[in-house]
């Protein structure tokens, strides 16, 4: 009996029966067809359109839907108002002042109505709470004069109205709070360093090429302003969906890309454009990615540049991203820095330009094995680029190899040359 159940279980696993409800699969994985095997569960990818995780401008394409606990936004009301767009912020700014003026204007009119001041308009012997207050419009104007502290003119409060004096104190205090809150919100929104990021540039493409006999992923950053970014730092992340060995689908998994954190190269002195380099080593997520695999993979590299604005001391952040189609294999960036009389000049017309260079099409793992076996000479610069010393070094190495070979097996140089 136990053997029959075990055989039935094995048959179910072989034919690919899925034990879970497809409706419970995450939304990001619904375009994938689950396949069950005896070792692991794989997801066969279906056709779906590509979508950027982050725009080139730094805007994240993430929408927060079905948020039920909306009260959390009200608990942090100041940040919520600052994050609003300008048109909504100005609308809230106008509505708050208008509502407070109308509210206190109604209370001033209500006091005058209860005291009977509206029935004795023009009576010289009657002492009203507020002189020359004849209706709701005049009460509304008196509320504006009180809250904005522009000074009383035709309408003024009298000393025979204690409830009016208390209301005057309350409106003055609440008006100051509203002014501090709304003006502070507008000031913070105006002084945000988001516009400073507009003058921080990222290259349109990232490149992969050889640098110091190692494959490197590189991109270029620059600052258009003469005022520098203080304590500038750069970091990068690889955004790529993956599946664990247990069959769990992780959409938009984030993996750190080392751009010099261990050596301090991630701390930038951004006076002129800099090329940020990521060495593709064993710890790199691109360790086993070749040129052919680059065109088959789907990933996105997000780069984040942070620093303090020199003029204000506020933290500024600029972001950009590179999809797999924007990573050029076998390219280098065109130099933009030239030496002039007494200064260095940066030509931003060629900031995004690249040129092709001799780069192996294999992955960094295979390249490291070739280097250990001494088969890396074909990817080094050609002899005219290396100069006479390199040519002499290659000739000396060839002569040394001839001397080391047995005469019976090696033959003469002329014989090998003819072959």
Curated annotation (Swiss-Prot):
Tell me, what controls this protein's activity? Heteromultimer composed of KCNJ3/GIRK1 and KCNJ5/GIRK4 is activated by phosphatidylinositol 4,5 biphosphate (PtdIns(4,5)P2).
What is a GO molecular function of this protein? voltage-gated potassium channel activity involved in atrial cardiac muscle cell action potential repolarization
Extracellular-side positions: 112-135, 155-163
Q: Where is it located?
A: Membrane
> Which InterPro entries does the entry mention?
Ig_E-set, IRK_C, K_chnl_inward-rec_Kir, K_chnl_inward-rec_Kir3.4, K_chnl_inward-rec_Kir_cyto, Kir_TM
Modified positions (Phosphoserine) are 5
The record's intramembrane ranges read 136-147, 148-154
Effect on the protein upon substituting residue 348 to N: Found in patients with hypertension with ACTH-dependent aldosterone hypersecretion; likely pathogenic; loss of channel selectivity
> What biological-process terms (Gene Ontology) are attached?
membrane repolarization during atrial cardiac muscle cell action potential; potassium ion import across plasma membrane; potassium ion transmembrane transport; potassium ion transport; regulation of heart rate by cardiac conduction; regulation of monoatomic ion transmembrane transport; ventricular cardiac muscle cell membrane repolarization
Topological domain, Cytoplasmic: which ranges?
1-86, 186-419
Question: What Gene Ontology cellular-component terms does the record carry?
Answer: I(KACh) inward rectifier potassium channel complex; plasma membrane; voltage-gated potassium channel complex
Q: Does the keyword Membrane apply?
A: yes
Q: Which PANTHER family did the record assign?
A: G PROTEIN-ACTIVATED INWARD RECTIFIER POTASSIUM CHANNEL 4, INWARD RECTIFIER POTASSIUM CHANNEL
Report the protein's function.
Inward rectifier potassium channels are characterized by a greater tendency to allow potassium to flow into the cell rather than out of it. Their voltage dependence is regulated by the concentration of extracellular potassium; as external potassium is raised, the voltage range of the channel opening shifts to more positive voltages. The inward rectification is mainly due to the blockage of outward current by internal magnesium. Can be blocked by external barium. This potassium channel is controlled by G proteins.
Q: How does it assemble?
A: Associates with KCNJ3/GIRK1 to form a G-protein-activated heteromultimer pore-forming unit. The resulting inward current is much larger. Associates with KCNJ6/GIRK2 to form a G-protein-activated heteromultimer pore-forming unit.
Please give the name of this protein. Answer: G protein-activated inward rectifier potassium channel 4
């Amino acid at each position: 009996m136990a053997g029959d159940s075990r055989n039935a279980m094995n048959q179910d696993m072989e034919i690919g029966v899925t034990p879970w409800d497809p409706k419970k699969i995450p939304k990001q994985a619904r375009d994938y067809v689950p396949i069950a095997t005896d070792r692991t569960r794989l997801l066969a990818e279906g056709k779906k359109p590509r979508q950027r995780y982050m725009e080139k401008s730094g805007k994240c394409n993430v929408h927060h839907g079905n948020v039920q606990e909306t009260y959390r936004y009200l608990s942090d009301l100041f940040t919520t108002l600052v994050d609003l767009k300008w048109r909504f912020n100005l609308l809230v700014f106008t509505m708050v002042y208008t509502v407070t003026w109308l509210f206190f204007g109604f209370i001033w009119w209500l006091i005058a109505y209860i005291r009977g001041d509206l029935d004795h308009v023009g009576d010289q012997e009657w002492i009203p709470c507020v002189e020359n207050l004849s209706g709701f419009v005049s009460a509304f104007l008196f509320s504006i004069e009180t809250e904005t502290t522009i000074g009383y003119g035709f309408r003024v409060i009298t000393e025979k109205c204690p409830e009016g004096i208390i209301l005057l104190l309350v409106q003055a205090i609440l008006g100051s709070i509203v002014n501090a809150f709304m003006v502070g919100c507008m000031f913070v929104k105006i002084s945000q360093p988001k516009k400073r990021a507009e003058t921080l540039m990222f290259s349109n493409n990232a490149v992969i090429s050889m640098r110091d006999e190692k494959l490197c992923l590189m991109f270029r950053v620059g600052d258009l302003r003469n005022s520098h970014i203080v304590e500038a730092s750069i970091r990068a992340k690889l955004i790529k969906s993956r599946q664990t060995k247990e069959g769990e689908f992780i959409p938009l998994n984030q993996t750190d890309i080392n751009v010099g954190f261990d050596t301090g190269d991630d701390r930038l002195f951004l006076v002129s454009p800099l090329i940020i380099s990521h060495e593709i080593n064993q710890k790199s997520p691109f360790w086993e990615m070749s040129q052919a695999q680059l065109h088959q993979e789907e990933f996105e590299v997000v780069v984040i540049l942070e620093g303090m604005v020199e003029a204000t001391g506020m933290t500024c952040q600029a972001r950009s991203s590179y999809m797999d189609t924007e990573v050029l294999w076998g390219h280098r960036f065109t130099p933009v820095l030239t030496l002039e009389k007494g200064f260095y000049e940066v030509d931003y017309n060629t900031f995004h330009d690249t040129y092709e260079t001799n780069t192996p099409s294999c992955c960094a793992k295979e390249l490291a094995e070739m280097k250990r076996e001494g088969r890396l000479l074909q990817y080094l610069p050609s002899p005219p680029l290396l100069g006479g010393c390199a040519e002499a070094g290659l000739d000396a190495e060839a002569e040394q190899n001839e001397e080391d070979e047995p005469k019976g097996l090696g033959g003469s140089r002329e014989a090998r040359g003819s072959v």
